[in-house]
Regions:
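Glycine-enriched alpha-helix->loop->beta-strand junction motifs that scaffold or abut catalytic
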Residues: 44-46, 64-70, 115-116, 179
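Active-site neighborhoods of metal-dependent hydrolases
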Residues: 12-30, 75-210, 283-289
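Divalent metal-coordination and catalytic microenvironments
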Residues: 20, 42, 69, 119, ...
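Extracellular/periplasmic ectodomains of large secreted or surface enzymes and adhesion receptors
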Residues: 269-289
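Short, acidic/turn-prone active-site loops that include or flank metal/cofactor-
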Residues: 55, 72-79, 271
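Acidic, glycine-enriched loop/beta-strand segments at the rims
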Residues: 195, 213-218, 227-263
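Active-site mouth loops of central-metabolism enzymes
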Residues: 1-8
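Surface-exposed amphipathic alpha-helices with a cationic face
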Residues: 35-46, 113, 173-177
Length: 289
């Protein structure tokens, strides 16, 4: 929804909350006043706001009370030279821009932790040259869109982690080690070559390859999301009295993280499902609806 004033931002939050919306995502071109009004309106209802930001820096958003930032430092405008207030300078943050001032990056991570802003990593979108698992479920035209617009020449899952991706994992690890609430997400779907579910495995692999212990990567992928949603007492870990969906894996991903893909059975609400049959049922259809 396009917003033009702080009043319209607050009104939009109230309208969609009345329809049952439980959280909100701000996008690139909101002003600080508009974002602040949306956050205040959401918080009055006990709801949260996340954001893929640009016109507003991460530090500014933290001051406004945002609950989460999407894509970590990937979309941050804090490192853009001559950034103008309330204007998006365009383009993602480059590897060189992030590397130019390590002290500034570290201080920003500290600030996000201090302000209790969660940090959602979406690493798989930067790893489609090495890893694009699950694209066989795409409709042919959607798959062609991705393969024709692949950001980098296709490589192998065994290829070294690209330097830009390694840098982003490093920021996620630093945030996690500082006590920040790191969340795991995937972005984008469709022509971006990132397939939900499959890409969650890629996220876990990226974290482990970038220095996380396997247990830390799993925590970021499960319990931390539940904690952010305020549901950690019910979901997020396997414990007596909690609700838990489970997977049976033919391997040991704590030894070889790539074994996380070897899923034999998925248990959802106590019922076991064959993942191969589920995938075959949607093969060639994803993206049609």
């Amino acid at each position: 929804m396009t917003i033009g004033t702080p009043e319209a931002a607050a009104k939009a939050v109230d309208f969609y909350a009345d329809q049952g919306a439980t959280s909100f995502k701000a996008y690139t071109n909101l002003t600080r006043a508009e974002l602040g009004a949306a956050i205040q309106a959401a918080h009055r209802r006990g709801l949260k706001v996340t954001g893929h930001l640009c016109s507003v820096t991460l530090r500014e958003a933290a001051d406004l009370g945002i609950d989460d930032i999407e894509h970590g430092f990937m979309a941050a405008s804090d490192f853009k030279a001559n950034k103008q207030p309330d204007l998006c300078p365009g383009g993602g943050t480059s590897e060189a821009e992030l590397a130019a001032d390590p002290a500034k990056a570290d201080a920003l991570l500290d600030y996000l932790v201090q302000k209790k802003v969660a940090y959602t990593s979406t690493l798989a979108v930067r790893d489609t040259a090495r890893n694009s698992p699950g694209i066989e479920v795409y409709a042919p035209d959607v798959r062609a869109l991705f393969e024709n617009n692949r950001r980098q020449p296709k490589s192998s899952p065994d290829a070294p982690m690209p330097s830009g991706l390694k840098q982003l994992v490093g920021f996620a690890k630093a945030f996690y080690d500082k006590g920040g609430l790191l969340l795991v997400g995937t972005d984008p779907t469709g022509g971006g070559g990132v397939v939900p579910g499959f890409a969650n495995h890629t996220e876990i692999e990226n974290l482990v390859q970038g220095g996380f212990r396997f247990e830390e990567a799993i925590k970021a992928s499960t319990l931390n999301g539940a904690a952010y949603l305020g549901r950690a007492e019910k979901i997020g870990t396997v414990a007596a009295g909690k609700q838990a969906d489970l997977v049976l894996i033919a391997g040991d991903p704590s030894t070889d993280v790539r074994d996380v893909r070897k899923v034999e059975i998925v248990f959802k609400e106590g019922v076991g499902y064959d993942p191969k049959k589920l995938i075959d049922a949607v093969r060639g259809k994803a993206g049609l609806y």
